Amino acid sequence: MAVRNIIFSVIIPTHKRSVLLSRALQSVKSQSQERDLEVIVVSDVIDSSTDAVCNFYLGIDDIYIRRNGVAGPSDSRNLGKSLASGHYILFLDDDDAWHPDFLKNLYEGIRLHPNHSLYFDCSVVKETRGSSEPRFISESVLNLVNILTMDVYVKNQVHMSCFAFPKALVNNLSFDRSMRAYEDWDFQLSVYDQEFPIYIPLLGSRIFEVDDSSSDRRGSSQAATDLNAVFDYLYVYRRHPGPDDRIREMRQQLLTSVGFRIDKDLL
């Protein structure tokens, strides 16, 4: 039997959201370049509906794990990354999806820029999740050309699902399980400390957002929006010192705007 040459590994952490996970996996498994893809789903809870969805969509060469331990995407992503066989690592939230032909277009991108981190466009879908099935409201495309700049050391700029990372580059990086939020940003900065991603003009992920009370996104929770967010920012700043005086001044201004006065030389 011929050994598969896996180009892409996509890691999908999930937590008891089988309906949304089904949408994500359907978009992944319908890719025209799907033969070059390994799908790794990591659930942090025992859930029969999640089992059924993974049994339906995943193939013999894919991986589905129900892990123990503290719930949360960081440990799930770290576990998935440690098992990945692809030359490139992608991350997808269980409530998001991929556009058709994304992988085919991404394959052309990596041929132009081999062994380099890449980022790409996305669309943002507004929906409500008050019923058993999410209800579509609107969708708009985000062109991310020139969006990623050194100002990312002040605030995050690009969604995690808009990147393809060479496995060799991120092998020794991990998501910080101690963070309440912004662990994606912290991980990205660890990449930028090594190299800055290259933009390629293709439409990648569909990022689904819920603006009403039916939202269950962790980033919309109280822990991610109150002063805990400031402490997580300080934590990220400590782990990734400002690369120049301009960035340190911008960090200082941001913290001052929420009532924290800190010497810029500490940022």
Language-model features and meaning:
Residues 1-27:
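N-proximal low-complexity "stem/linker" segments adjacent to membrane-targeting elements
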Residues 93-97:
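The conserved acidic donor/metal-binding loop of glycosyltransferases
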Residues 25-26, 86, 99-111:
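Short alpha-helix within the catalytic core of nucleotide-sugar-dependent glycosyltransferases
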Residues 25-67:
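Acidic donor-binding segment of Leloir-type glycosyltransferases
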Residues 75, 104-169, 217-220, 237-249:
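Flexible acidic/His/Gly-enriched loops in nucleotide-sugar-dependent glycosyltransferase catalytic domains
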Residues 143-227:
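Conserved nucleotide-sugar donor-binding catalytic segment
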Residues 89:
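Short aromatic/hydrophobic "clamp" motif used to bind/position activated sugar donors
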Residues 68-84:
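Glycine-rich, basic loop-to-helix element that forms the pyrophosphate-binding segment
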